């Protein structure tokens, strides 16, 4: 494999990095490529894509809260990112994950009241249902808004990490919300188990919406996310009772039968069950 092929492979590995493990991936890639300058240049575009798709968060310069770095907050003409809460733009370093050079931004006066109301309700929703979650609300135009939520849980001592991401596009003209929710979990104690799910709900909005309607919108979102969390829980239980059982030999290497009625008591099941709901869904 020549240098160009190694860099292409490295870029692909970046996009597949599990939650919270990208620094470990980059460290391993440095050993494989053995050329830091070439590696940094070769993976730059993949890092930018990964960070925006994974809703990487950064503390806003001069403030204590975090904002989501994503395509919804990208200012195309400058390449800077927007924190709509403080009306601040900043430069984001995709390698060091730091923000710098803050500047004030003039936002659209027509869309700001509704956006601000959605943000207030989103932050309350986070406080009620997520542990250390981050939310950002962007106005694409006076009739279209994007709510983004991300929550991470990293537990390297017990060999697992997880991330919840959700995005809801609110279209006032169409009277609908289209959503995407992603769950990524990586368990790697003496093995490599990954869970990846995608949920794409679409639902209608109440009529006659005003900024005061924001709590109703977040209540609908909370209901849908709660349904999704319960469906994941049911699917996980089914995996333990049926799918995993069919994959195992009748007698393992220990020559002892595995009690499948107690599968949730084994270590993998115990770890995942103990941390179900760690993202704080309803």
Give the predicted meaning of each segment.
Residues 116, 120, 124, 128, ...:
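Surface-exposed short loop/turn segments
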Residues 9-13, 25-28, 42, 46, ...:
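Charge-rich, solvent-exposed alpha-helical interaction surfaces
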Residues 49, 53-58, 194, 198-200, ...:
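C-terminal/domain-edge helix-coil "capping" segments
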Residues 48, 52, 58-124:
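Membrane-inserting hydrophobic helices used for pore formation or membrane fusion
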Residues 24-28, 80, 146-148, 180:
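Ordered hydrophobic segments in well-structured contexts
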Residues 14, 43-51, 57, 118, ...:
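Generic hydrophobic, helix-prone segments enriched in Leu/Val/Ile
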Residues 1-77:
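Alpha-helical protein-protein interaction scaffolds
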């Amino acid at each position: 494999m020549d240098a160009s092929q190694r860099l292409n492979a490295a870029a692909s590995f970046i996009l597949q990095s599990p939650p919270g493990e990208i620094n470990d991936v980059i460290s391993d890639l440095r050993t494989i490529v053995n050329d830091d300058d070439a590696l940094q240049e070769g993976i730059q575009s993949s890092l930018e894509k990964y960070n925006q798709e994974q809703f990487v968060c950064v503390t806003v310069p001069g403030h204590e809260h975090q904002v989501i770095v994503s395509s919804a907050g990208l200012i195309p003409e400058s390449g800077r990112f927007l924190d709509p809460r403080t009306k601040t733009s900043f430069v984001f370093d995709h390698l060091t994950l730091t923000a710098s050079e803050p500047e004030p931004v003039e936002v659209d006066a027509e869309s700001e009241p509704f956006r601000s109301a959605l943000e207030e309700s989103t932050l309350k929703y986070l406080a009620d249902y997520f542990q250390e979650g981050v939310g950002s609300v962007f106005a694409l135009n006076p009739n279209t808004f994007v709510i983004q939520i991300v929550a991470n849980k990293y537990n390297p001592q017990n060999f697992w990490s997880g991330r919840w991401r959700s995005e809801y596009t609110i279209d006032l003209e169409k009277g609908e919300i289209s959503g995407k929710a992603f769950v990524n979990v990586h368990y790697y104690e003496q093995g490599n188990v990954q869970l990846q799910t995608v949920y794409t709900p679409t639902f209608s909005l109440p009529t006659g919406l005003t900024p005061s309607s924001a709590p109703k919108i977040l209540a609908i979102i909370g209901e849908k996310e709660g349904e999704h969390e319960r469906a994941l829980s049911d699917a996980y239980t089914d995996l333990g009772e049926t799918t995993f059982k069919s994959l195992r030999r009748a007698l393992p290497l220990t020559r002892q039968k595995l009690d499948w009625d107690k599968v949730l008591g084994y270590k993998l099941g115990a770890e995942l069950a103990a941390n179900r709901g760690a993202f704080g869904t309803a």
